From Swiss-Prot:
Residue ranges annotated as propeptide in the record: 23-98, 117-131, 164-168, 202-220, 236-253, 271-275, 293-297, 315-321, 339-341, 359-366, 384-388, 406-410, 428-432, 450-454, 472-476, 494-498, 516-520, 538-542, 560-564, 582-592, 610-614, 647-742
Protein name per UniProt: Feeding circuit activating peptides
Main location: secreted
Keyword presence, Signal: yes
Any single GO CC term annotated in Swiss-Prot or TrEMBL for this entry: extracellular region
Subcellular location(s) of the protein: Secreted
C-alpha cells in the first residue's frame, strides 16, 4: 500500500472516530472543536487527492508524448495505470464534488460511470478524451461496451466504441435499431442471455513473425504495431494475445461466434479454400446469413424484410435450371432448395416455419419426414409406401391447418386448430356438402358447396391470407380480395350498389374502413390483437377518439377542440411513452404542467414538472427503463441505467453541487457541497460540508472557507443541530487528535 493510500485510510478512520466521539460525549450539542477537526480532515483530504491526480495526469501525458515521438513507450506503458482504480464514492472521497455521481446500479445495469481528468483543460492535448475511465463490465441485455469516447447510440443498439482521431481510429459500424453486431480492433465483452453476438479476433495474415511486427505491452492484451510502415499507430492496428506472437502459425485469424440462445439472429460458417467469413447485413429480425459452395455456385440470400425466415436460390451449371424462392413477405412460411438428387430444407431455428426432406436413394422407405419443428411452425406431414395413411403431426401455435385421410375412411377431418389457423374443411361420402369448421382468431374463412348449388367458390389462399372470394353465374356482383401479408379482409362492389368499401391494407394491418355516399361518418372496425391503431370521426362530432388498443399497439392520441388537450391512452406492452399538456398553456397561464402516463414494460422514461415548486420528479419506472433524474431520484428497478440526486438544499446554483450561501456577517459566497454520514452503525450523524469561495461584502477575495451543517441524535433521544462557519481552516496535523487521545 502506498503512503498516499495509507494516509487517506488513516484520515477516514480518524474522521469517523471523531464523529462517534462527538456524538457519545455530548448531551445535546457537539462541541465546535470536534466539528472543526472534521473540517480540517476534509480540507487535507481534498488537497491530497488533487496532488495525486496531477501526478497521474503528468505520467499519462508523458506516455502519450513518448509513443508519438517513437521513444520507449512499450516499457513506460507497463508502469502507468491507464484506467485508475475506481474511487470510493462514499463520504469525503470525491475531490470533484461538483460532478454527478451515478448511483450504484443493480442487476442488468447498462453501464457504470466515467470520470474526466484534469488533462481536459490542456489546449494542445487533442486526445484528452482518451483519458476517460472505461465503463463497467456489462451484464445481460447490455447496451454497449466501452471506448474512450462513446458513440451516440440509437434505438436498441448493442454497443460500439472507437478511439482517437486521424490514423488512430478504432471504429465500430454505426448500429441501427435492433442491429446485430459489428466491431473491430478490441474484443467485445462476454454477453449474457439474449445476447446478440459474441466476439471475434482478427490477425494480420496467415503467418506472423516476431521480426516483422512489434508488440507493445498493454495490459492482458498487446497492441500489434507494424514496424515496416513508418507509422506504428495505423488504422489497421490489431490487438492480439502476447502468447501468440511467436513465429508459428497464429490463431488470431479465426472468428468465432458465441453460442447464441433464443431469438438469436444468425450464425455463419466458413469454407476452406476461400478463407472468408462474412455475414450479410441483416435487417430487422432477420434470421440468418449466408453460405457459400466450393464449386463456385454461390448461394445467396435474398434481401429479406421484417420477420422473414429465409430464402435462397441456386444455379444448376449443367442444366441451367434455376430454382428460386418466392419473394417472401412478413411472417413468410418457408422456402426450399435442391442440390443434386436430394431435396433438403435448411435446419431452421426459433421462428421456424416448417420443413421437409426426401432422399431419392431411399428406395425401401421413400419416406418423407418432417423435421422436429419449434415455435411458430406452420405444419408438416409425412408419408411412407407401406403406410397408406397420411397423418399430420401435432402442431403448435401458429399452425395453419392440416388434414389426414385413410383408405378405409371416407371422411376427411380437420384437426382442431388453434390460433392463427387459416381454415379447414371436412367431407363425408354421405354428405354432399362441404362445411367449414368454426374458426378462431386470425382464421380466414371457409366455403361450402352442394350438388344443388350452382355457385362456385374459390379460395385463392396465400401466406396467412384471410379469405378469398366467390362468384355465381346469376350473380352480377364480383368480389375480389387484394390480399397481403396478414391482411384481414378486402372489399367488394356491385353495379347496383352505390356504396364502395375499400381497405388499404398494409403489412400487419388489421382492419380497414368503409364509407357510403349517404353516410357522412367514417367508422373504424373493431380491432383485435396485432392491431396498430385506428380512429373515427363524424361531421357533427368535433372530437377524435382512439379505439382501445391491444397488445403490440404503438400509441394513440385524441384531441378536443374546446380544451386543446392532448392525452395518451393507457398503453400496454411494448408501448413507448406518452405525454399530455394542460390547456392553460395556450392561454398564457403559468401552469404548464407536463405529466407522463404510467408506463408499463419496455418503457423508456418520463418526467413531469410542477410550476410552483420548480421540482422535477421521475415517475416510478418498471423494467427495461432507461433512466430518469430529479433532485431526489426514485428507487429504480431492474434494467435501469443510472440516475443521480442532489441535495434538496440546492435552490440557487445553476449546476449540481455549486451553491450560494450567506454567512452570519452578510457575505455572499459560492461553493461546492459534499454530504457526509458518520456515527455508529445507525449512521445517525449526517450533514453537509461546503467549501466556499468568492468576494465578501467588503470586496475581498475569499478562498477555502468551510461551512458545516450537522444533525445528530443526542443521548436522550433528541435531535441536535449545529452550524459552523469557519473562515480559516487550520492544518489537519494541528487539529486532528491522536488515537490515544480519543
Amino acid at each position: 500500500m502506498t503512503f498516499a493510500a495509507s494516509f487517506r485510510a488513516l484520515l477516514c478512520v480518524l474522521f469517523c472516530a471523531a464523529l462517534v466521539h462527538c456524538k457519545t460525549r455530548t448531551k445535546r450539542y457537539v462541541p465546535h472543536s470536534e466539528l472543526w477537526r472534521i473540517l480540517a480532515v476534509v480540507d487535507e483530504l481534498q488537497r491530497e487527492q488533487a496532488a495525486e491526480q496531477r501526478q497521474e495526469d503528468a505520467l499519462a501525458l508523458a506516455l502519450r508524448s513518448d509513443i508519438a515521438g517513437g521513444g520507449g513507450g512499450g516499457q513506460l506503458a507497463d508502469n502507468v495505470r491507464w484506467f485508475p482504480e475506481t474511487y470510493d464514492y462514499g463520504a469525503l472521497a470525491d475531490r470533484d464534488v461538483d460532478k454527478r455521481v451515478f448511483d450504484s446500479l443493480g442487476g442488468y445495469e447498462v453501464h457504470g460511470f466515467k470520470k474526466r481528468g484534469s488533462l481536459d483543460a490542456i489546449p494542445q492535448d487533442t486526445d484528452a478524451s482518451s483519458d476517460k475511465r472505461a465503463l463497467d463490465s456489462l451484464g445481460g441485455f447490455q447496451v454497449h461496451g466501452w471506448k474512450r469516447a462513446l458513440d451516440t447510440l440509437g434505438g436498441f443498439q448493442v454497443h460500439g466504441w472507437k478511439r482517437g482521431s486521424g490514423a488512430e481510429k478504432r471504429q465500430v459500424d454505426r448500429l441501427g435499431g435492433f442491429q446485430v453486431h459489428g466491431w473491430k480492433k478490441r474484443a467485445l465483452d462476454s454477453l449474457g442471455g439474449f445476447q446478440v453476438h459474441g466476439w471475434k479476433k482478427r490477425g494480420t495474415g496467415g503467418q506472423m513473425h516476431a521480426s516483422s511486427p512489434r508488440v507493445v505491452p498493454w495490459g492482458s492484451r498487446s497492441l500489434l504495431a507494424d514496424t515496416q510502415s513508418g507509422h506504428r499507430w495505423k488504422r489497421d492496428t490489431e490487438l492480439v494475445e502476447n502468447r501468440q506472437t511467436t513465429g508459428q502459425q497464429t490463431e488470431v485469424n479465426k472468428r468465432a461466434l458465441d453460442s447464441l440462445g433464443g431469438f438469436q439472429v444468425h450464425g455463419w460458417k466458413r469454407s476452406g479454400e476461400a478463407g472468408k467469413r462474412q455475414v450479410d447485413s441483416l435487417g430487422g429480425f432477420q434470421v440468418h446469413g449466408w453460405k457459400r459452395a466450393d464449386d463456385q455456385g454461390k448461394r445467396a440470400l435474398d434481401s429479406l424484410g421484417g420477420f422473414q425466415v429465409h430464402g435462397w436460390k441456386r444455379f444448376d451449371n449443367s442444366a441451367g435450371e434455376k430454382r428460386a424462392l418466392d419473394s417472401l413477405g412478413g411472417f413468410q412460411v418457408h422456402g426450399w432448395k435442391r442440390a443434386g438428387d436430394k431435396k433438403s430444407l435448411d435446419s431452421l431455428g426459433s421462428f421456424q416455419v416448417h420443413g421437409w426432406k426426401r432422399f431419392d436413394n431411399d428406395i425401401s422407405g421413400q419416406k418423407r419426414s418432417l423435421d422436429s419443428l419449434g415455435s411458430f411452425q406452420v405444419h408438416g406431414w409425412k408419408r411412407s409406401d407401406q403406410d397408406n395413411k397420411r397423418a399430420l403431426d401435432s402442431l403448435g401455435g401458429f399452425q395453419v391447418h392440416g388434414w389426414k385421410r385413410a383408405d378405409d375412411d371416407g371422411k376427411r377431418s380437420l384437426d382442431s386448430l388453434g390460433s392463427f389457423q387459416v381454415h379447414g374443411w371436412k367431407r363425408a361420402d354421405e354428405d354432399d356438402k362441404k362445411s367449414l369448421d368454426s374458426l378462431g382468431s386470425f382464421q380466414v374463412h371457409g366455403w361450402k358447396r352442394g350438388d344443388e348449388d350452382d355457385k362456385r367458390s374459390l379460395d385463392s389462399l396465400g401466406s396467412f391470407q384471410v379469405h378469398g372470394w366467390k362468384r355465381a353465374d346469376e350473380d352480377d356482383k364480383r368480389s375480389l380480395d387484394s390480399l397481403g401479408s396478414f391482411q384481414v379482409h378486402g372489399w367488394k362492389r356491385s353495379d347496383e350498389d352505390d356504396k364502395r368499401s375499400l381497405d388499404s391494407l398494409g403489412s400487419f394491418q388489421v382492419h380497414g374502413w368503409k364509407r357510403s355516399d349517404e353516410d357522412d361518418k367514417r367508422s373504424l372496425d373493431s380491432l383485435g390483437s396485432f392491431q396498430v391503431h385506428g380512429w373515427k370521426r363524424a361531421d357533427e362530432d368535433d372530437k377524435r377518439s382512439l379505439d382501445s388498443l391491444g397488445s403490440f399497439q404503438v400509441h394513440g392520441w385524441k384531441r378536443n377542440s374546446p380544451g386543446l388537450k392532448r392525452a395518451l391512452d393507457s398503453l400496454g406492452g411494448f408501448q413507448v411513452h406518452g405525454w399530455k399538456r394542460n390547456n392553460e398553456y395556450y392561454s398564457g397561464a403559468e401552469n404548464e404542467k407536463r405529466a407522463l402516463d404510467s408506463l408499463g414494460g419496455f418503457q423508456v422514461h418520463g418526467w413531469k414538472r410542477d410550476q410552483p415548486g420548480e421540482k422535477r420528479s421521475l415517475d416510478s419506472l418498471g423494467s427495461f427503463q432507461v433512466h430518469g433524474w430529479k433532485r431526489n431520484l426514485n428507487n429504480l428497478g431492474s434494467f435501469q441505467v443510472h440516475g443521480w440526486k442532489k441535495n434538496s438544499a440546492d435552490e440557487m446554483g445553476d449546476k449540481p453541487g455549486v451553491e450560494s450561501y450567506q454567512d452570519n456577517s452578510g457575505k455572499i459566497l459560492s461553493g461546492k457541497a459534499q454530504e457526509f454520514e458518520g456515527g455508529d452503525e445507525t449512521g445517525d450523524i449526517h450533514g453537509v460540508v461546503r467549501t466556499l469561495s468568492g468576494v465578501d461584502a467588503s470586496g475581498k477575495e475569499r478562498e477555502n472557507i468551510k461551512e458545516l451543517d450537522a444533525k445528530f441524535k443526542t443521548n436522550d433521544g433528541g435531535v441536535g443541530v449545529e452550524h459552523i462557519f469557519v473562515d480559516n481552516v487550520k492544518s489537519a496535523d494541528d487539529d486532528v487528535p491522536s488515537a490515544g487521545q480519543m
